[in-house]
Structures are given as structure tokens and as C-alpha cells.
């Protein structure tokens, strides 16, 4: 079983409009509300793929109750309740544009943060792999993910970590390392304080920087150009076919689902990388975020090429 962790989930509200009119009333007919957050996208894709998954994280108030109720019934869930209210994230879809209004979310009390560590520690007993995704809510220390990774390491459970900014920096500077990180070029540039290109020789050098020491897997998305990966001392390039992109949002989360599944099933390097890329591409072909059509899985799988570089 895979444990997905979403520390700052949301109710994702979509308002489709033909035109967004400023400084007046906009009436919406077709409103959708879903349980949102990067970790919950991972959860949905794992469930659709057929892997056993347990979802956890922080929820609060009536919106927190709504969120838990609107996670697929096939998914096991064990969220931790806090005093603050789970946030809303609003997407206004107008024409070919999208305007987002994102609430900051609840402020987590220090004791709630400590109590969740105990909750997380207990959940580790029933899972084989951990996937941690997304931002930290206000109130938790910047190195909170390092604390989760430390507990998972002590329990012998591999961790796939998908976060960015100060939270990722804190983990990389910690002695407690996740098994996998999944930065993109922009995030690599931010971490190192210099521009990082997609040149493979440069990426090889970058991923051997001291900052990344101790990370078993580093998987870098190159968008339409595929993926570059480092596993131990071995480097890989994944070539992918061109596809019709409908909605790329959530493709990174779907990739995390594939990585986690590959670890769960102890797949070879090539199998893990292909699965991760295929699930990311399948998400991009769908209108709904964090959704894959498994009927198209094998046809895409057969087109990917993994080569050692």
C-alpha cells in the first residue's frame, strides 16, 4: 500500500464562464467542487491504476469534512483534524484563460503539528511506500517535511517527495533524505541560484552537486522533451512521443503516482521511468486534473524509450 500525504489540501472550485466581466455580477451555472491538492491528485491516479492507497493529511472544519467525503470511496483515508478551516481554491475558466484565487489555508498550531507526526508514525506501520506532495500550511516549520522523512526512514519506508522552494531546500540540507525527488528545471535553478538548461551534460553535473548527495533517485521533467533521471551513479534519458495535450495540470502529480507505484512493485529502473512518464502523459490527455484513462496505457507505454546516457 502507498501512503499519500497532503498537508495543505483544498476544495477546488471551478467556475466556467464564456467571459469574465470585471466590476459586475458573473452568474455561473455549471460549478464543480472537488477534493484538491497535489497529494490527492496522486491518490486518484494510484486508485485508477489499481494500486492500494491510503490518503492522509490535515483537514479542518466543514470544508475539511466535505473534502474527506468527496474522496473516492475506494480510497482508504485517515486524515488528521485541526482547528483551522480547510481552504478553497477557485479557478475561473473564461474563454481560453484561467484566473485563480487561492486561499492561504489554515494556520496549524504547534501542538497539531506534533500530533500529526505521531499520527503519521502509526500509519507507516501499514504501508510500503510514502508519497509526500505540495506546500506546507502556515504554522508548520519549514523543515517539517524533513521530520516526516526521518520517521519514514526509521520505519524503512521509501519516500517520494514532491515539493519546492524553502521546504525542499530544508530537506536537501537535512541529514534525512527522501528516496526520490522530482524537481523541474526551474526548481533546480532556484535551488542552485543559477540558470540550469536542459543540456544533458549540464544536468549530469548539476545532479552531482553536493546539495543532492544522498538522494537515491532524482527525476527531472523536461516537458515535451521527456525526462532526465539519476539513479545512484547511473543516468537515464526518457524519450516520449508527441501527444495531444488537453490539460497539463496535475501531470507532475500523476508522474509521482507512477514513481510510487514503481517503488511499490520493485520494478526495474526502465519500468519505473516508463510507468511514471506514461501516467503523466495520460493525465495531460484528460480534461479532469488527476485523472487517467487506463485504456490508453499500454499503447503509450510501448512508445517510450529509456536509454542510459
UniProtKB/Swiss-Prot annotation:
GO terms for cellular component: cytosol. Its EC number is 2.7.1.144. It comes from the Bacteria. It catalyses: D-tagatofuranose 6-phosphate + ATP = D-tagatofuranose 1,6-bisphosphate + ADP + H(+). Keywords: ATP-binding, Kinase, Lactose metabolism, Nucleotide-binding, Transferase. Pathway: Carbohydrate metabolism; D-tagatose 6-phosphate degradation; D-glyceraldehyde 3-phosphate and glycerone phosphate from D-tagatose 6-phosphate: step 1/2. CDD domains: FruK_PfkB_like. GO terms for molecular function: ATP binding; phosphofructokinase activity; tagatose-6-phosphate kinase activity. One of its GO terms (biological process) is D-tagatose 6-phosphate catabolic process. Belongs to the carbohydrate kinase PfkB family. LacC subfamily. NCBIfam families: 1-PFK, lacC, PRK13508.1. This is Tagatose-6-phosphate kinase. The lineage of its organism: Bacteria, Bacillati, Bacillota, Bacilli, Lactobacillales. The gene is lacC.
